[in-house]
Each structure stands twice: as structure tokens, then as C-alpha cells.
Amino acid sequence: MFLEEKLNLVWNKILEEVSKKISPQYYERFIDTLKLETINSEKCTIIAPSATIKTHVERKYQSIIENAILETCGDKIPVEILIETKAASPLQSILEKSFDQKDFQFNPDYTFETFIVGDCNRLAYTAAKECVRKPAEINPLYIFGSVGVGKTHLLHAIGSELTKKDPWKTVCYVDISSFMNEFRFALQSRELIESFKIKYQSYNCLIVDDIQLLSTNAEKTQDEFFALFNFLFERKRQIVIASDRPSSELAIHERLKSRFVTGVQADIQYPDREIRKGIVTHHSKIMDLGLSEDILDFLADQIEEDTRLLLGALNDIYLYKKSYSLLFLNLDKVKEIVKNRLYRKKNIEFSHDRIIEAVAKEFNLNTAEIMGKSRKKELIIPRHICFYLLHNVFNVNKSQVGRLFQTQHTTVIHGVRKTEELLSNNKEMRFLVERISSKYKLQ
């Protein structure tokens, strides 16, 4: 056992070696807070002031400390890090508990191998694979698309593959609502804010979902996320962001938007027929449903909006077969089982026609003119109003609107924006849109 009076001398020599391997900023934040408790030929015990510091040092610097001990003492001595026994505040304990949890557990079913690739999602899939192959080469990766198109699947695939590739690297998956709530909680004290910063700055990869929920009202949260983004970006840490809309449509400060466009923006469209058929075929095999080709075709043809609706239909079929101990089902029975999932689709198609007819009538046009390709001014405004009504009022996805009018997704975005500008300045047009909205939202 080393004598008590020699502990400080030995510790200072160890710290001197450690300081050669770590930047001054991190040395001051993490290493300088540690204390040497005991050291002998069997074990070196070090005290950390908090669970946050302990976890971070164990993840990032323990091997550096052990090598410094070898350099100083000539022996390879294992290091044990303990937490100082002073009473922690209840708030600090809560935050440290969240930091001390195991890394996020990614869904094992959401892998690159199980992701059905087609023209609607190929760019996002390729970019996601590249994030794993060469982290931070594409940075950030911004994936956007409507609900149920596969964004979450790709996020989990990226996280799980990065973890498999290098188990020592830490990956954080967080939805922006959780990030905002955690940050608001941390604002209660300087100590909590410091722990919050340490937590998020420690990750090698940050995956953020639902970024569209970050609004301009959350000034401090935006500032914190902006600082975190820059911190990770400058250190070439991979950042992946998912949203239901392009970054240009986010209600956030321009400086954040400008960061998001520095990498790749990958749009995932609603799955085409080929992709839908691939999804139902793949999952029906996994679930051992034994569905015939005509049933698979029916499901792929009838459920277009959302892959989750497809999977929900398969779950309905599975439960029905299990409940009645059936080996096979015919097409008529499947139609009966999933009829409630098809009802929504029929209603949406019905609304399309009614809304377009209503707009055409207001402008003394016919629907064929509005649905056509003509660029005449007297047709563009009504067409844009249709875009606006279908998307903003009746919640039809922009990709669906684009398919309905046989135009590009970006054209729909432009049309919706132009209509929003028009309505803010033109009282007559605003009344027209409100009249159509109120009439058909009640039906």
C-alpha cells in the first residue's frame, strides 16, 4: 500500500501523463474533477463527483488513465471509479439516472436487410448506409417524409449497425419532444445543465426524430440544440435528423435550417405498388400467414397511404386465423377482415373529388382544367388552392396530392406556400377557402 503522503505525488504524475492525451477543455471538465482514493498492485480506486462524470470517464478515458498508471508505476493496474458519497440532490439523481441507463435499444426488426428498397426511398436508404460505412461523411443526414413511409425503420437500422460496427461508440436516439422536456428540466440548476451538456456531447452519433416539433417558441431549446449540433458537427460526429417535412418548412430559426442543408436531404415518398407488394410478401412470410398471391395483390393495391396500415392489416389477418385456428383464408374473407382499414382510403378519395369540384365551381372552371398541365394564371391560383385545401385543411399528404395532380412533390410545396401568402393578403380569397373548408369538413 502506498503511504498516504505519497498519494498526491503519484496522482499528479498520473494526471500529467493523462493530460498529454486529452485536450485541455475535456481535461478540465472531466479529469480534473477526479480524486485518487487508493492505489496498490491490485487496484486503483478513483472517486468521481457524480454518476454523470463517472459514466463518461469510464466510457471515454478509463483506458487512458490505466495506460498513464502503467507509465508512472510500471504496473498494469485496473481502475475502479466510484461515486463520491455526498448526498445528491433529488433533481441531480433523476437526470443522472437517465444518463446512466444503457444505450438505446434499437428494434432488431428494423434493419437494412428488412428494408424494402424502391424508387420512393432509394436515396434515403443509400445515404443511411453511407452514414454507417463512413460516419460523418454525410453530415447531417436529414430524412423527411410522411407518417408510415419508413423513416423510423432507417433510423433504427443506422443506430443498430453503428453499434454493431463499433461497440465502443455510443449512439443516442431521441425524439425532439424528449430532448425539449429534458432540457427544460435541466434549466432548474447549473449543475443539471452541466450534466445535460455532458450527456449529449459524449455521443459519437446523435439521431433525432420528429424535429418538426421544435418550434420558434422554444428559444432556449433551439439555442441549446444549435450549440449541440455545432459541437458534434465540428468533431465529425454523425448527426441524423428525421422530420415529416423538408427543413425549409420547419418553424425554426434560419441558422438551424442552414445547418440542416449542409449534408443530404433525402425525401421518402409513399411506397409505390412494387414496394407495397414487397412489404406484404416479406411480413406475411415472417408471420407465417400462408397468404395466396391474389390476397397479397389485393392488400398492395388497396392500402396505399401508410405502410403501418399494411402491417396493421396483416396483424388483423394473423389474429383472425389464430382465433379460429384456420390454416388458410380466401380473398373474400380477407376483404371482410380488413374492410375497416379500407374505409379511410375510400373517404379520402371521395374528399379529393368533392374539394376539387368545389374549387372549380368557385372559379367557373371544370375539374379537368384544374387537374390539367396548363400554366395559365387563371388556372394556377385555383390549382394551388386545391393543393392548400387538400394538404393543410384535409390532411392529405403532399406526395398524395402530387400523385393526384400528376406533378412533383416540390410543386405542391410551392403551391401551398403561394396560397398561404395569398390568403394572408387577400380577404376575398380567405373567405372563399374558409367557405369550402367549413362546408366539407362537416360532411
UniProtKB/Swiss-Prot annotation:
Q: Which UniProt keywords apply?
A: ATP-binding, Cytoplasm, DNA replication, DNA-binding, Lipid-binding, Nucleotide-binding
> Can you quote a single GO CC term?
cytoplasm
Q: Which InterPro entries match?
A: AAA+_ATPase, Chromosome_initiator_DnaA, Chromosome_initiator_DnaA-like, DnaA_C, DnaA_dom, DnaA_N_dom, DnaA_N_sf, P-loop_NTPase
Q: Where does ATP bind?
A: 148, 150-152
Question: Domain IV, binds dsDNA: where is this region?
Answer: 322-443
Residue ranges for the region (Domain I, interacts with DnaA modulators) are: 1-80
Identify this protein by name: Chromosomal replication initiator protein DnaA
Q: Which organism is it from?
A: Leptospira interrogans serogroup Icterohaemorrhagiae serovar Lai (strain 56601)
The UniProt gene name for this protein comes to dnaA
